[in-house]
Protein backbone atom coordinates (compact mmCIF):
# COMPACT_ATOMS: atom_id res chain seq x y z
CA UNK A 1 0.00 0.00 0.00
CA UNK A 2 1.54 3.29 -0.99
CA UNK A 3 1.59 6.45 1.13
CA UNK A 4 -0.81 8.43 -1.08
CA UNK A 5 -3.51 5.77 -0.89
CA UNK A 6 -3.11 5.52 2.90
CA UNK A 7 -3.41 9.32 3.26
CA UNK A 8 -6.63 9.35 1.20
CA UNK A 9 -8.14 6.56 3.33
CA UNK A 10 -7.29 8.35 6.58
CA UNK A 11 -8.78 11.60 5.30
CA UNK A 12 -12.04 9.91 4.36
CA UNK A 13 -12.41 8.10 7.70
CA UNK A 14 -12.64 10.01 10.99
CA UNK A 15 -10.12 8.66 13.43
CA UNK A 16 -10.45 9.74 17.05
CA UNK A 17 -13.13 11.74 18.82
CA UNK A 18 -11.33 14.97 19.65
CA UNK A 19 -12.52 16.73 16.51
CA UNK A 20 -16.12 15.64 17.02
CA UNK A 21 -16.16 17.02 20.59
CA UNK A 22 -14.85 20.35 19.37
CA UNK A 23 -17.59 20.39 16.75
CA UNK A 24 -20.25 19.63 19.40
CA UNK A 25 -19.17 22.51 21.64
CA UNK A 26 -19.00 24.90 18.69
CA UNK A 27 -22.57 23.96 17.80
CA UNK A 28 -23.67 24.27 21.43
CA UNK A 29 -22.28 27.77 21.71
CA UNK A 30 -23.90 28.80 18.44
CA UNK A 31 -27.33 27.48 19.54
CA UNK A 32 -27.14 29.36 22.83
CA UNK A 33 -27.30 26.26 24.98
CA UNK A 34 -25.58 28.23 27.71
CA UNK A 35 -28.33 30.67 28.67
CA UNK A 36 -28.61 33.08 31.56
CA UNK A 37 -30.46 30.41 33.56
CA UNK A 38 -27.60 27.95 33.12
CA UNK A 39 -26.79 24.95 31.00
CA UNK A 40 -29.77 23.46 29.20
CA UNK A 41 -29.00 19.77 28.84
CA UNK A 42 -31.98 18.94 26.61
CA UNK A 43 -30.10 20.44 23.63
CA UNK A 44 -27.40 17.78 23.93
CA UNK A 45 -29.69 15.03 22.68
CA UNK A 46 -30.22 16.83 19.40
CA UNK A 47 -26.53 17.52 18.83
CA UNK A 48 -24.79 14.32 19.88
CA UNK A 49 -26.66 12.11 17.47
CA UNK A 50 -27.84 8.55 17.32
CA UNK A 51 -27.29 5.97 19.96
CA UNK A 52 -29.11 3.77 22.36
CA UNK A 53 -30.85 5.48 25.26
CA UNK A 54 -29.76 4.68 28.75
CA UNK A 55 -31.73 1.94 30.31
CA UNK A 56 -32.80 2.22 33.87
CA UNK A 57 -31.66 -0.52 36.19
CA UNK A 58 -34.57 -2.63 37.28
CA UNK A 59 -34.43 -3.04 41.01
CA UNK A 60 -35.88 -6.25 42.31
CA UNK A 61 -37.52 -5.69 45.66
CA UNK A 62 -37.80 -8.85 47.67
CA UNK A 63 -41.27 -8.67 49.06
CA UNK A 64 -42.31 -10.21 52.31
CA UNK A 65 -45.38 -11.49 50.52
CA UNK A 66 -43.55 -14.64 49.48
CA UNK A 67 -42.47 -15.27 53.06
CA UNK A 68 -46.03 -14.72 54.26
CA UNK A 69 -47.35 -17.20 51.71
CA UNK A 70 -44.85 -19.84 52.83
CA UNK A 71 -45.82 -19.22 56.43
CA UNK A 72 -49.52 -19.41 55.59
CA UNK A 73 -49.09 -22.77 53.83
CA UNK A 74 -47.14 -24.15 56.78
CA UNK A 75 -49.79 -22.95 59.20
CA UNK A 76 -52.54 -24.50 57.05
CA UNK A 77 -50.75 -27.83 57.30
CA UNK A 78 -50.88 -27.46 61.09
CA UNK A 79 -54.63 -26.75 60.86
CA UNK A 80 -54.58 -23.37 62.63
CA UNK A 81 -57.76 -21.40 63.15
CA UNK A 82 -58.01 -17.61 63.30
CA UNK A 83 -58.99 -16.10 66.62
CA UNK A 84 -61.19 -13.02 66.27
CA UNK A 85 -61.69 -9.95 68.47
CA UNK A 86 -58.20 -9.64 69.94
CA UNK A 87 -57.44 -5.95 70.35
CA UNK A 88 -53.87 -6.08 71.66
CA UNK A 89 -51.11 -8.48 72.68
CA UNK A 90 -48.38 -7.69 75.21
CA UNK A 91 -45.23 -9.78 75.61
CA UNK A 92 -43.21 -9.08 78.74
CA UNK A 93 -39.43 -9.27 78.49
CA UNK A 94 -37.01 -9.91 81.34
CA UNK A 95 -35.44 -6.46 81.13
CA UNK A 96 -38.75 -4.77 82.03
CA UNK A 97 -39.75 -3.74 78.52
CA UNK A 98 -42.89 -4.92 76.76
CA UNK A 99 -43.43 -5.82 73.12
CA UNK A 100 -46.85 -4.35 72.33
CA UNK A 101 -48.93 -5.46 69.33
CA UNK A 102 -51.94 -3.26 68.58
CA UNK A 103 -54.75 -5.06 66.67
CA UNK A 104 -52.76 -8.16 65.68
CA UNK A 105 -54.00 -11.10 63.64
CA UNK A 106 -53.88 -14.22 65.79
CA UNK A 107 -54.03 -17.84 64.63
CA UNK A 108 -53.95 -20.80 66.98
CA UNK A 109 -53.68 -24.56 66.85
CA UNK A 110 -54.52 -25.99 70.25
CA UNK A 111 -53.51 -29.64 69.55
CA UNK A 112 -50.02 -28.62 68.42
CA UNK A 113 -49.76 -25.83 71.04
CA UNK A 114 -48.94 -23.23 68.36
CA UNK A 115 -49.92 -19.58 68.25
CA UNK A 116 -49.07 -17.16 65.44
CA UNK A 117 -49.18 -13.37 65.79
CA UNK A 118 -49.15 -10.99 62.82
CA UNK A 119 -48.66 -7.28 63.22
CA UNK A 120 -46.19 -4.53 63.95
CA UNK A 121 -44.66 -4.87 67.39
CA UNK A 122 -43.52 -1.82 69.30
CA UNK A 123 -41.10 -2.04 72.19
CA UNK A 124 -42.41 0.01 75.10
CA UNK A 125 -41.53 0.39 78.74
CA UNK A 126 -43.68 -1.27 81.35
CA UNK A 127 -44.59 2.05 82.94
CA UNK A 128 -46.25 3.21 79.70
CA UNK A 129 -48.69 0.29 79.66
CA UNK A 130 -49.37 -0.38 83.36
CA UNK A 131 -52.55 1.67 83.86
CA UNK A 132 -54.25 0.22 80.78
CA UNK A 133 -53.38 -3.44 81.33
CA UNK A 134 -54.11 -3.89 85.04
CA UNK A 135 -57.79 -4.69 84.48
CA UNK A 136 -56.87 -7.32 81.84
CA UNK A 137 -54.59 -9.36 84.10
CA UNK A 138 -55.61 -12.35 86.14
CA UNK A 139 -54.23 -13.37 89.58
CA UNK A 140 -51.33 -15.36 88.10
CA UNK A 141 -50.40 -12.50 85.83
CA UNK A 142 -50.54 -10.03 88.70
CA UNK A 143 -47.98 -12.08 90.65
CA UNK A 144 -45.65 -12.21 87.67
CA UNK A 145 -46.22 -8.49 87.11
CA UNK A 146 -45.17 -7.80 90.71
CA UNK A 147 -41.96 -9.79 90.19
CA UNK A 148 -41.35 -7.92 86.97
CA UNK A 149 -41.94 -4.57 88.67
CA UNK A 150 -39.51 -5.51 91.47
CA UNK A 151 -36.83 -6.47 88.98
CA UNK A 152 -37.48 -3.23 87.11
CA UNK A 153 -37.04 -1.23 90.33
CA UNK A 154 -33.83 -3.11 91.13
CA UNK A 155 -32.50 -2.29 87.68
CA UNK A 156 -33.36 1.38 88.20
CA UNK A 157 -31.58 1.37 91.59
CA UNK A 158 -28.49 -0.25 90.06
CA UNK A 159 -28.45 2.32 87.29
CA UNK A 160 -28.77 5.09 89.88
CA UNK A 161 -25.97 3.61 91.99
CA UNK A 162 -23.67 3.47 88.97
CA UNK A 163 -24.49 7.11 88.27
CA UNK A 164 -23.55 8.03 91.86
CA UNK A 165 -20.24 6.15 91.56
CA UNK A 166 -19.39 8.23 88.53
CA UNK A 167 -20.21 11.41 90.47
CA UNK A 168 -17.91 10.30 93.35
CA UNK A 169 -15.05 9.76 90.94
CA UNK A 170 -15.49 13.30 89.65
CA UNK A 171 -14.65 14.67 93.14
CA UNK A 172 -11.14 13.17 93.07
CA UNK A 173 -8.70 15.73 91.68
CA UNK A 174 -6.38 14.79 88.86
CA UNK A 175 -2.67 14.64 89.56
CA UNK A 176 -0.65 17.48 88.12
CA UNK A 177 2.34 16.41 86.11
CA UNK A 178 5.62 16.85 87.96
CA UNK A 179 4.11 16.87 91.46
CA UNK A 180 4.30 13.96 93.88
CA UNK A 181 1.82 14.10 96.75
CA UNK A 182 3.22 11.01 98.51
CA UNK A 183 6.49 12.75 99.37
CA UNK A 184 4.57 15.49 101.24
CA UNK A 185 2.81 12.92 103.45
CA UNK A 186 6.05 11.43 104.81
Curated annotation (Swiss-Prot):
Pfam families: NAC (PF01849). Its main location: cytoplasm. One of its GO terms (biological process) is protein transport. GO terms for cellular component: cytosol; nascent polypeptide-associated complex; nucleus. Residues 153-186 are annotated as: Disordered. Residues 65-130 form the NAC-A/B domain. Keywords: Cytoplasm, Nucleus, Protein transport, Repressor, Transcription, Transcription regulation, Transport. The keyword Coiled coil does not apply. Residues 167-186 have a biased composition (Acidic residues). PROSITE patterns: NAC_AB. It is found in: Cytoplasm; Nucleus. PANTHER family: TRANSCRIPTION FACTOR BTF3 FAMILY MEMBER. Belongs to the NAC-beta family. Component of the nascent polypeptide-associated complex (NAC), a dynamic component of the ribosomal exit tunnel, protecting the emerging polypeptides from interaction with other cytoplasmic proteins to ensure appropriate nascent protein targeting. The NAC complex also promotes mitochondrial protein import by enhancing productive ribosome interactions with the outer mitochondrial membrane and blocks the inappropriate interaction of ribosomes translating non-secretory nascent polypeptides with translocation sites in the membrane of the endoplasmic reticulum. Part of the nascent polypeptide-associated complex (NAC), consisting of egd2 and egd1. NAC associates with ribosomes via egd1. This is Nascent polypeptide-associated complex subunit beta. It comes from Aspergillus fumigatus (strain ATCC MYA-4609 / CBS 101355 / FGSC A1100 / Af293) (Neosartorya fumigata).
